[in-house]
Amino acid sequence: MKFRGKVARYISEILEEGKTLHFSLFDPDKIFDLDSLHDIASKLIEAGTDVFLIGGTLGISQDKLDNILSILEEFSIPLIIFPSNVNLISNKADAILFLSLLNSDDLYYIVGAQIVAAPIIKRIGLEVLPTAYLIIGHGGTAGHIGRARVIPYDNIELIVSYSLAANYMGMKYIYLEAGSGASETVKPEAIKVVKNTVKDGVVIVGGGVTSEERARNLVLAGADIIVTGNVIERDHQKALKIIKEIKSIRRTSNAIK
């Protein structure tokens, strides 16, 4: 909880330096060996990751979530919860992505879960990062569970319209999600147009970031934050190379202040 109340500023300061942030996503349901988590986290820190993001869609218990956060809080970067439902909240984290799945057909994922979660978040004092969550292309488990009307990869106009609507509703962060295990990322062209249209928004991109080249293309398109999760689980060495690639590129887009 070292960063509670300071996470948004932490993100802004890194962006102001002309750098893209990397978030390492840990899915508690896919962590089978808690003893190795500390070692993996150490290597991710050394490679340059900026935040540990903790979340998943299925099979998450409160005890396991808290145990993972207890291990990760030893490190000097923020811990942010990436919730799939109201059960994924913990006072051991610094902040929470307060998500609204804007392209869901189910009001529960647009505003219902948020109404239930808000008093809990207020009571435990988590820093809130208001985030529009848009599921694009592949969608994956999150798209299925969240009953998303998935936006096609190549429908850039629709992606931009959703992003602009989110910005007008006061959401600071726009998360463009291709889905866990996606065969491709959100198109760099879409990211570029979103960044040029929503100039004061922080654009988060996740899903399909499986190579250094893909990561580089996202950075050059203007992504503010890049999330990797599956590649960390499957191939630590490749994940480390991707992080180093992201952190090696100097951004040319305007930093968010």
Swiss-Prot record:
**Which pathway is this protein assigned to?**
Membrane lipid metabolism; glycerophospholipid metabolism
User: Per UniProt, what is one GO molecular function of this protein?
Assistant: magnesium ion binding
Needed cofactors, names only, are: Mg(2+)
**Protein EC:** 2.5.1.41
Q: Where in the cell is it found?
A: Cytoplasm
Binding-site list for sn-glycerol 1-phosphate: Y175, L176, E177, A178, G179, S180, G181, G207, G208, G229, N230
Coiled-coil regions, chain positions: none
Q: At which positions is Mg(2+) bound? A: D27, T57
**Which UniProt keywords are listed?**
Cytoplasm, Lipid biosynthesis, Lipid metabolism, Magnesium, Metal-binding, Phospholipid biosynthesis, Phospholipid metabolism, Transferase
Q: Which CDD domains match?
A: PcrB_like
Query: Which superkingdom heads the taxonomic lineage of this protein's source?
Result: Archaea
Recorded hits in Gene3D superfamilies, A to Z, give: FMN-linked oxidoreductases
Q: Which GO terms describe its cellular component?
A: cytoplasm
Name the reaction it catalyses: sn-glycerol 1-phosphate + (2E,6E,10E)-geranylgeranyl diphosphate = sn-3-O-(geranylgeranyl)glycerol 1-phosphate + diphosphate
UniProt-listed InterPro entries: GGGP/HepGP_synthase_I, GGGP/HepGP_synthase_sf, GGGP_HepGP_synthase, GGGP_synth
Q: GO:BP terms for this protein?
A: glycerophospholipid biosynthetic process
Q: What does this protein do?
A: Prenyltransferase that catalyzes the transfer of the geranylgeranyl moiety of geranylgeranyl diphosphate (GGPP) to the C3 hydroxyl of sn-glycerol-1-phosphate (G1P). This reaction is the first ether-bond-formation step in the biosynthesis of archaeal membrane lipids.
Which family does the record claim for this protein?
Answer: Belongs to the GGGP/HepGP synthase family. Group II subfamily.
Q: Which NCBIfam families match?
A: GGGP, GGGP-family, PRK04169.1-2, PRK04169.1-6
Question: What protein name does the entry list?
Answer: Geranylgeranylglyceryl phosphate synthase
Protein source organism: Sulfolobus acidocaldarius (strain ATCC 33909 / DSM 639 / JCM 8929 / NBRC 15157 / NCIMB 11770)
